[in-house]
Amino acid sequence: MKMFESLDSSATKSGRDLWAEICSCLPSPAQEDVSDNAFSDSFMDSHPAGESHTAAADSAVQPAGKPWAPLHDSEVYLASLEKKLRRIKGLNEEVTSKDMLRTLAQAKKECWDRFLQEKLASEFFVDGLDSDERTLEHFKRWLQPDKVAISTEEVQFLIPPESQAEKPEAGDKPAAAEQ
């Protein structure tokens, strides 16, 4: 390890000379005056290993050997960033399968509701076929039983025959009491 040997020497060096010793990459003052302080950096390493100082100064003025070219995947990367930005902003244009199923279920429900609300039988069946209200109600009940009201025939079918027989007998007894 080398320490300061000439600390007590009377010879003083200028700051430029000291920096020139520390960093040999700095241009000399004569070269600074020649270059008219124009910015000409190519952002390339100006001093490759094994190259002298003067050769490096000449390469800074020359254009780089390879022209700039985009990376092969730069377009893909930019597209993915734009997609993430749209998703964050809520502007996602992609339709997911969940969205498709939700839309189809809603459309199906709206079609069935419209069908069940319609009263004209001619819209539902082919012209020339006879269809009465009972057929239409039966068809609606078969498709969506929870949407159609129960008929009087179905109520009679649901009531057990024993309770139907008791009703007329109960009706006859009060009539006999009145006489």
Swiss-Prot record:
It is a peripheral membrane protein. Residues 36-65, 158-179 are annotated as: Disordered. GO terms for biological process: cilium organization; regulation of clathrin-dependent endocytosis. Its main location: membrane. One of its GO terms (cellular component) is clathrin-coated pit. It comes from the Eukaryota. Pfam families: CCDC32. Keywords: Cilium biogenesis/degradation, Coated pit, Coiled coil, Membrane. It is found in: Membrane, Coated pit. InterPro entries: CCDC32. Residues 75-98 form a coiled coil. PANTHER family: COILED-COIL DOMAIN-CONTAINING PROTEIN 32. Interacts with AP2S1; the interaction is direct and mediates association with adaptor protein complex 2 (AP-2). Regulates clathrin-mediated endocytsois of cargos such as transferrin probably through the association and modulation of adaptor protein complex 2 (AP-2). Has a role in ciliogenesis. Required for proper cephalic and left/right axis development. This is Coiled-coil domain-containing protein 32. It comes from Mus musculus. The lineage of its organism: Eukaryota, Metazoa, Chordata, Craniata, Vertebrata. The gene is Ccdc32.
